[in-house]
Structure formats: structure tokens, C-alpha cells
Amino acid sequence: MYSFEHYIHFVDGKVTEENLPKEVVVTDTTITFKYGEPIQLHVVVDVKNEMSLHYVFEDNVHAEVIETRHVEENGVLNRTFTNGAYSHVNFFNENEGTGKNTYLDEGHSSHDSMLQLGYSELSDASIEASYTFELDGEGADVRLRMAALSKDKEKKHYKVHIKHNASHTTGIMDNYGVAKDEAHLVIDGIGTITNGQNGSASHQTNKIIVFDPKCYASANPFLYIDEYDVQASHAAGVGKMDEEHLYYLQSRGLTKRQAMQLITYGYLMPVVEVVDNQMIKERFELALSKVGA
């Protein structure tokens, strides 16, 4: 059930199981990571109604975290991230919700910190999500990668915002999605560099492939730049599946379902290729290998 030796399991805000290293302190629903040995922690969250969860990474902390969440119909999960100076955190999110779920993330990064996030958005749920990360200290770096699948009649809407409040900060997002059947999938990528934050870089990619004519998909990039000496770019697009590719795979002996599964896997794989952390890479690959299985 747990991917690391150390773990904690919350059910509606109450701890039901735990095996924590000495560097991790839990108070109610706040998990504090203290400086010491590098930390690996698997957090499992079960939400029936609404829950708030707070991650605090103190200065100089090095941590790898996997969060697996099971959110029930109309469940809401609110999370905050506080990243101390010189902290280096790799964080992977696995959604396994059902029904309609709401996710709200807010993060703040201090100077010279690094936060790399992976979002595996492959659940059987309709989702409304807002993920906002603010770079508050010089040299802060946030890199967010998301793979999203919307199928059947699911409706999934993601707003991903990285805001630069300090100079020489880096914010990168790569969001890839697949929509099939009669599903809706909308990804809004937002990069904001406020006045005076020179030397900063904001880059984003938002791409969705559509399998079926009854799907609705939209990939929307927004850049709000109030400073001259910066780097900023965006790439966005919604495209249809290549029917010839599908026919070719079927001619090689695959069923249509197997061929579509392979195409889905291949389209979402670029999100893995841009990740430079082995744990996040492996979790993405494991999640994507189960798509359509």
C-alpha cells in the first residue's frame, strides 16, 4: 500500500496510520519537514467531505513526497505548500477520486528553493482544480508537470498559475491532456511576472489531443508580464488524433482499444521526459502504463 518506508494516512483529517522519520513532525493536518537526512514520505489521504492539508518544508530540507488521494463525491481537498530557503522538494500527486472533486493548491517558495511537482490526473472523476504557486524569494524555482485524461462524460478543468514576486525566479509548467468519448477537458496555464522581477523566466506548454467528435477541449495560455528584462514563452494547442496512425497500429495486430491506449500513452509521455527526478519519472510511467488497461 505504501511506496516508501515512511508514511502517514489521513482519513477526513484524522491520522489512522503512520511511520514517520524523526525529521517529520505532524500537528493536526500540518506536516513539517525539518532539516536533517533526506526524507522520503508517502502520504495517503481519504476525503469524504472537505479537508485541508498543510506541507511545511523548512530551510535546507531535501524531500521526496508521494501523495495518493481518494476523494469521494463532492469532496474538497485544500492544500498549502511552504518551501523554505534552499529547500529542494520533489512532490508527486496521484488522484484516485470518484464523482465530482475539487482541488485547491496554494504554494509559497522562499529564496533559492526548488519545488518540482508532478500531477497524475487520470482518475475517474470530474474535477475543478486551481493550483497557484508564488515565487516569493530571489532564485526560487517551481516546475510543474501534469498529465490529464478526461473520458466518458467527465468534465475536468484545471487552472495552473505560477506567479513571480521576486527577481531571478523560474516558473515552468508542462501540461498534457487527452480527451475522449464525450468528455470535457480545459487547461488554463497562467504565468505572471510582476514589476521589478528582472532576470526571471516564465515558460509554459499546454497541449491536448482529442479522440472523439463529441469531446470538448481547450488549452489556454496566459502571460502577464510587467517587466522588460525577463524570459517568457508559451505553447498551446488542441489537436485531433491521427486516424492513419490508429489504422496503422490496428494493421499491426492491435485491437482498436489497444491502439488508442498506446496513442494515449505516447501523447502523455512528453511530460515524463522533461522531469529530471527519478521518483517522479517512475511514478508517471507507472500511472500512464495503466491508462485504458
Question: How does the language model describe each region?
Answer:
Residues 5-8, 13, 146, 171, ...:
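Glycine-centered structural positions embedded in regular secondary structure
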Residues 264-277:
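Short arginine-rich
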Residues 1-38:
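Long, low-complexity, mixed-charge
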Residues 23-247, 251-252, 275, 281-293:
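Conserved beta-strand/loop scaffold segments within soluble protein domains that form the structured core
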